[in-house]
């Protein structure tokens, strides 16, 4: 027991902490998925279904689903899990710059998760949506401690992310192997670096906003209360100044993972490496100056709306550069459709669809009609549920052999992909039609006219759950398998381009006994 505590509770090893993050992300992901299925069961038919007319509970489910998936599934798994596991290995460093800071970055998350879950259990729960807009989140509409607990949960996970990003930035700037210049950094490392900067710059703004909300609720300040000279729109500006970079935080590490996978399975180096790097940096910078496109309906000036429309559309340019570079990487390649590559190609296709609906919503005039309808839900679920999540699965299949030293079952992995692909598309594609027909978000009941597409959508979510079940069967079979994984399972001969394939599978507790030196390539 003592050894167990020493290794897992007090761990300062980046691989062990990465493993903890991945397990934590899986647990939170299952909980978030359960909530989403409850939502789809309620919406399967018109009228009150499983929640018996408790509309507050429906909103609590919506809120908890969003928080779980964003802050406790995608971020811990992508940045904390794959980031911790592979950034030090990819840059040839013995560990992270601040190993004990790394430990507390992880251990702040379970208490944060407990606070979030308790917020759903006290009083009537926090039914404010993940945006926590006042006045709905104010003390008059949500008396009791539920919103306060959700705010504390956000504070805690925010501190965790800020500490983690400081650690990543320091590690990547200071601990690269000799000869590994910034212009030779693997793309996944670049993506984590940009993500860390986004976190560092955006989370303090969220912290300020929710702290003001906390004092509005408990100490009678009026930051967001017009009666005392405050303004609820100020909260929206602060929240979305964080919230928009946040969606890029969720997807950027995925971009890095996909770049590695597409390159590996096309047997070609990534097309336009520098372009890929600068595209990611541009996305990071532009992500900070488009926040008000979430607020086209609050009465912004027409010139303000014109600016945010234009700026939002500019983001499509670096994103397009990335998409076309992935396609160019595959062009003329000798492509192998193993499971990671299937998820990567699925990612590229579905992320493009999500980006396309994003361009539609960027038009402020169109958005007036589509704001807060299911069209928006369809848009960001194509980007997240099929972008971020597919990137996570792709990264899992790509690296699980390296993490465990065991080979995953290829056929079952492909079955997992096809069931999930079918399920998520069946869930979210009909939502475009519902949104165009005017069905509003976050409402637990709807007119009979919307019944058909909602039935399809709910069926799709049940299919997705079968896919998730397949995934956990894959995890179980991998961990209990006898098939050892080669140091470089994807290489035809020794043509690895990144360091993680040059160390054993699994890597030793201390990866590099001496610093690797990176020489000029021919």
From Swiss-Prot:
Positions of disulphide bridges: none
What Enzyme Commission number(s) does the record list for this chain?
Answer: 7.1.1.9
Which parts of the chain span the membrane according to its record? 19-39, 67-87, 104-124, 149-169, 187-207, 238-258, 270-290, 313-333, 341-361, 380-400, 417-437, 459-479
Query: Binding positions for Cu cation?
Result: 244, 293-294
- CDD domains, from UniProt? Cyt_c_Oxidase_I
Please state the protein's primary subcellular location: mitochondrion
Q: In which pathway does it act?
A: Energy metabolism; oxidative phosphorylation
List GO BP terms, alphabetically.
electron transport coupled proton transport; oxidative phosphorylation
- Cross-referenced SUPFAM superfamilies: Cytochrome c oxidase subunit I-like (SSF81442)
**Site of the 1'-histidyl-3'-tyrosine (His-Tyr) crosslink?**
244-248
Q: Which GO terms describe its molecular function?
A: cytochrome-c oxidase activity; heme binding; metal ion binding
Question: Which keywords label this protein?
Answer: Calcium, Copper, Electron transport, Heme, Iron, Magnesium, Membrane, Metal-binding, Mitochondrion, Mitochondrion inner membrane, Respiratory chain, Translocase, Transmembrane, Transmembrane helix, Transport
- Which superkingdom is the protein from? Eukaryota
Residues reported to bind Mg(2+): 371-372
In this chain, Fe(II)-heme a is annotated as bound at 65, 381
Cofactor binding, per record = Binds 2 heme A groups non-covalently per subunit.
Listed binding positions for Ca(2+) are: 42, 47, 444
Cross-referenced PANTHER family? CYTOCHROME C OXIDASE SUBUNIT 1
Functional summary from the UniProt entry: Component of the cytochrome c oxidase, the last enzyme in the mitochondrial electron transport chain which drives oxidative phosphorylation. The respiratory chain contains 3 multisubunit complexes succinate dehydrogenase (complex II, CII), ubiquinol-cytochrome c oxidoreductase (cytochrome b-c1 complex, complex III, CIII) and cytochrome c oxidase (complex IV, CIV), that cooperate to transfer electrons derived from NADH and succinate to molecular oxygen, creating an electrochemical gradient over the inner membrane that drives transmembrane transport and the ATP synthase.
| Family named by the database record | Belongs to the heme-copper respiratory oxidase family.
Q: What is this protein called?
A: Cytochrome c oxidase subunit 1
The scientific name of the source species is Marchantia polymorpha
